[in-house]
A protein has these predicted regions:
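Cysteine-nucleophile amide-bond enzymes
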Residues: 1-134
């Protein structure tokens, strides 16, 4: 049996390798983080998907209660589903929320149709709030 060993990758390198569809996973140790993991039976408490298009910086599509980073799509801050620069979102989740981060890279070629589909989904869902959190 072989044991796969993972090594830490500096954020700048991980962000430079980010492709549309990659998943970023975050895990913290606060009471809220532990409650989320217990309620969802998950080893992580926050997940986002990378959107990396053309010459734009990598973006992170995720949902959160926080409203401190301006949403790239809407141009305002709000709660719920949001599209942020990956550097801003991952930085906040690491530094402000004291979360560890992992990435899972997608293992397919993302087509133009797939990119168009995610942009349509973002257009439809961006800014959708969590129930009762307006």
């Amino acid at each position: 049996m072989t044991t796969e060993r993972h090594t830490a990758t500096p954020f700048e390198e991980a962000a430079a390798l980010a492709r549309t569809g990659d998943v970023w996973l975050f895990r913290g140790s606060s009471a809220a983080d532990r409650a989320i993991r217990a309620a969802t039976n998950s080893p992580v408490n926050h997940v986002g998907m990378v959107i990396a298009l053309d010459d734009l910086p990598p973006l992170l599509w995720h949902a959160e209660l926080g409203q401190t980073i301006p949403d790239v799509w809407a141009g305002i801050t709000h709660r719920g589903t949001q599209l942020h620069r990956l550097a801003d979102a991952a930085g906040q989740w690491h530094h402000r929320y004291c979360q560890e981060a992992w990435t899972r890279q997608i293992d397919i070629d993302v087509t133009t149709e797939m990119e168009d589909s995610i942009l349509h989904t973002i257009d439809e869902l961006d800014g959708r709030t969590f129930p009762g959190t307006k």
